[in-house]
Amino acid sequence: MKTIILNASPRKNWNTAQLLKEAQKGAESVGSEVEYIDLYDLNYTGCRSCLACKRKGAEPCKCYWKDDLSPLIDKILRANAVIIGSPIYFGEPTAQFRALYERLIFCIMSYDSHANNFNGKVNVGLIYTMNAPKNYFEAAMHPTYNTTESLMGFLGGKVMTYASCDTVQVADYSKYDMSAFSEEAKKAHHDAQFPLDLQAAFNMGADLSK
């Protein structure tokens, strides 16, 4: 088994990364080989609409744009599982997440039938972190991500989503202009909830990598 874990956060050691590293431990606990990648270290953009993947005679399920993302897409399509983590900014995952998502899905989608050219099976895990409370995420935000989850199903495996909500943004709020947030309340919630989030990420890594 091969599991690829992708950090779509610019922060390499904060909430999203911590959850992904627990997912890595979960994958490793069931014997999967894991490759962990920080997407912000790579040089790539979103889809350039070159349409090379749609040309007659083109190899199916291949992104032809020459940058750091195309070989990663090849790796994902050869893996057994991919777990992607992203913070939510203004209600959406990061630009790095979006660029990966649109290029990955577009290169496997048929423009003859809008069907799926990919015949493999890659399980997908999506981990989101955000300042919003859980009830707001479930009522107002999660429904907007249904398209993402549905299209990730083109990879042929199961798709799991987990949201870590009302997260702590910084270690010391006194150093920042963030008076809209209660540091005491944030940290109390973090101390109670984040260990559960870490366990959920571990379980996701194990479940998707079996």
PLM regions with names:
Residues 1-113, 178-210:
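N-terminal beta1-alpha1-beta2 submodule of the flavodoxin-like/Rossmannoid cofactor-binding fold
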Residues 8, 39, 127-129, 164:
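Cofactor-binding loop segments of dinucleotide-utilizing enzymes, especially the Rossmann-like FAD-
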Residues 47-49, 138-139, 171-176:
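Short aromatic-enriched loop/helix-cap "lid" or pocket-rim segments at secondary-structure transitions
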Residues 70-74, 122, 171-175:
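Membrane-targeting and insertion segments and their boundary/processing signals
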Residues 89-91, 132-133, 168:
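Short, catalytically relevant binding-site loops at active-site mouths
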Residues 95-96, 108-162:
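Short, glycine-/small-residue-rich phosphate/pyrophosphate-handling segment
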Residues 160-171:
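Beta-strand-loop-alpha "switch" segments that mediate conformational coupling across diverse proteins
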